[in-house]
Structure formats: C-alpha cells, structure tokens
Amino acid sequence: MVPLFGLFCIFSQLYSLCSAYVDITSGYQVFFNLPTNMTNNQICWLFQASYYDIYSDKSGRTLRTGRFEPGDQQSLIYRDTLVELEAITDSYEYSNLDLSTYNGPEPYNSETDYCTDIMDLVMRVYDEEGHYVHPVANNSTNACAHPTPPTLNNLLISNYSDGRNYKESSI
C-alpha cells in the first residue's frame, strides 16, 4: 500500500506537468511599463502608490503613479496574459522612473513588506490560464481598494523564499 503522502506527491507532480498556471515570481510578469532593475518589494510599493485611472481606461488595466515629479509620472498596465519569467526579453517595455522624486506621504521603505497585502488582488484579475479577466476594483481611485468578487481565485502562487506571497527576484 502506497502511503497517502506518496500518492499526494505523485498527483501533485502530474498536476504540475499538466497545469496551465503561471508561477508568479516577479512583478515584471504582471505589469508593463516598469522601471528596470526594481525589486518586487519596490514594484509592490509602486502598485500601492498608484491609482486606477478610470477616466482614460475603464477596463481597470491602467494605473497611474501618483505624487511623483511631473517628468517621472507614468502608467502601470496589467499584461493581457501573464508571462513566464524566462519569456521576458530585452524587448520588454521599461520606463525610467526615479523613485527619489516621489513626494507622497509614505515614501518607499526597504524594511517594509509591501507585497503581502496585494498579491491576492493580483491573483483575482487573471484566470487559471493567466489571462486578464476583469479589473481589481470598481470605480476606485485606490489600487488597494476592495476587489470585485473573484470569478477565479486559484492562480498558483508558490515557491516563495520567505513563506509569504512574493519573493525577491534578480530582475
């Protein structure tokens, strides 16, 4: 008789081979228009420091950075489809945002974990195959507002170095 743990391991290996899920290990897999060489913690902070621009894009895919110097304002745009980290190439669309020009109430602090609270929101905007399906928030000006009820809430997020929702990557 095969122990239950052994069966679980076999089924989980088979499942991972057949799964269409994308393992999110970097914000670069989720957003266009990010500055080069940001850590995931910085990406998560930037997400929180941004707001939905419902006047120019009612799909909910576009967020604008807030409280930066005029030359450093930009948009974060959800990808149509999540991509594997290996698929991101030199042709990726980067911007040149300077985080030091932010003049909002809570500037970036490297000691703070900005990712724990937002990954559930990111999970809710993509379906199981990694396709964008709906906006995170309805008519919200805050990127961290309560999300719309999810249609699919089981995007696989795994392999985190600290047991939390996101891990730092080398990008």
Curated annotation (Swiss-Prot):
Residues annotated as glycosylated: 37, 139, 159
GO (cellular component) term, any one: cell periphery
Annotated knockout phenotype: Leads to elevated levels of Ty1 retrotransposition and Ty1 cDNA.
Cell compartment(s), UniProt: Cytoplasm; Secreted
Domain of life: Eukaryota
Chain segments annotated as transmembrane: none
Signal sequence interval, chain numbering: 1-20
Alphabetical UniProt keywords: Cytoplasm, Glycoprotein, Secreted, Signal
Protein name listed in UniProt: Secreted protein CSS3
